Amino acid sequence: RRALSHRLPVGREYILGARAGNGERPGRQGIAVKVEAVTYTSGDGATSIPSYLADPGGHGPFPAVLILRGVAGPDDGYIEIAQRLGEWGYVALLHGWKVRGSDPPDGEVYDDLEGAMTFLRSAGRVDPKRLAVFGFCRGGIHALMAARAHEDLRVVVVFHGFAFRPSRARPGVEPYDLAEGVHVPLLVLHGTEDEQAPLADMRRMEARMQALGKPAEFKFYDGVPHGFAVRTHPGFRADAARQSFDEAGRFLATHLPGAARSGSDR
């Protein structure tokens, strides 16, 4: 693993007890979460992907979550999410897909997802049979693409994602059309006032998942705009963010056993 110099010093530790939650989700209060800059090679065999890895410390192997960020805002808000997942007892990889720009073609997205998944599977402290993906905004589209391409993913969580690509986006597979390829528990967390991904579209996605008999849950937050869960996004809403991460933690604890830590590791 080659360390990169980008915003965070490699190996720096963060104490995150303030975000440990209310006991309804997995986690340990006041633990040190190490975040380091890493790089790995895309599935195309040539492109380097600068990313961040959060490690919960203690004894592994751990379940792991691949974080697929949105377009807007700096990495900082997503690094905080990786730290939070580390605090819950997961290894978390913040995938640096924006090295491709803000709207890469699907072929590059799939290549880079392959590189990220290969990196996670080969990480010595990760249990390769316990992998999940969190997608935010545009990364929510990528999360559904990952679920179709990687059958070893056990859980998918999408925060303020899309049922259909924005009109200004590059043409590609529609999330709505990826529904049939989702065979694992899916949680969608969405605002009723999402100006980029209308509520009606997401309700249509919900109905399709139900018609297909998919193990999907949809949670809607009244009056909340796009980007509500990410602190550095213009649409951030603290109450909805807290509620959505409580839901995500509950969902992981239910569908990805072994995330909670016990005994001397608490």
Q: Which residues fall in each region the model found?
A:
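Short beta-strand/loop motif that positions the catalytic acidic residue
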Residues: 182, 188-190, 194
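Alpha/beta-hydrolase fold nucleophile elbow
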Residues: 125-136
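Gly/Ala-rich beta-loop-alpha elbow adjacent to hydrolase catalytic centers
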Residues: 135-139, 143
